[in-house]
Amino acid sequence: ASSKEIAEAIGIDSATVRRDFSYFGELGRRGFGYNVKELMDFFADILNDTSITNVMLVGVGNMGRALLHYRFHERNKMKIVMAFEADDNPAVGTTDENIPIHAISEIKERISEANSQTAILTVPSVKAQEVTDILVEAGVKGILSFSPVNLSVPKDVVVQYVDLTSELQTLLYFMRKG
């Protein structure tokens, strides 16, 4: 990425990017720009941020399976370490992408093994609150929810919603506008 591209992405001018990066030595090459992966690795080392965050996936339907196949750890510092599904689901007891799929009723026992307080929720809307309650009771403190319902959680639990319909509508709006 060029210094101009980096500057636009973070809202500063390109001269500031070049000057600030120069304090750390030669991070880029004139005319070629910066290798973003190398920059991220470089700054992660400086900030001592080399740890990987373990994440659990709850719901192994179509969306869940797609996320199991996504290589989070290759692009950033996150890794899905285990998945959970309804107790009677045939996927329970199997693995996908070397990720074990457990019964949701086992989450309390498995959460310490996962070494995670973060879950991705991809369950049907009608089950979202029930499953969220189970996650919270098991000690989960952060939930990325793909279910289009507002979840009720205690104040110490953070929920981030991914609403694909809203994102698509926003995209279409800007396509028509531009």
Swiss-Prot record:
Keywords, in A-Z order: Cytoplasm, DNA-binding, NAD, Repressor, Transcription, Transcription regulation
Any single GO BP term: response to redox state
MF annotations from Gene Ontology: DNA binding
Subcellular location: Cytoplasm
Organism domain of life: Bacteria
Amino-acid positions noted as binding NAD(+) in the UniProt annotation, renumbered to this chain: G59, V60, G61, N62, M63, G64
GO cellular component labels: cytoplasm
InterPro entries cross-referenced by the UniProt entry: CoA-bd, NAD(P)-bd_dom_sf, Tscrpt_rep_Rex, WH-like_DNA-bd_sf, WH_DNA-bd_sf
Major subcellular site: cytoplasm
HAMAP family: Rex
NCBIfam families: PRK05472.1-1, PRK05472.1-3, PRK05472.2-3, PRK05472.2-4, PRK05472.2-5
UniProt record similarity statement: Belongs to the transcriptional regulatory Rex family.
Function according to Swiss-Prot or TrEMBL: Modulates transcription in response to changes in cellular NADH/NAD(+) redox state.
Oligomer status and interactors: Homodimer.
Protein name: Redox-sensing transcriptional repressor Rex
Organism field: Streptococcus suis
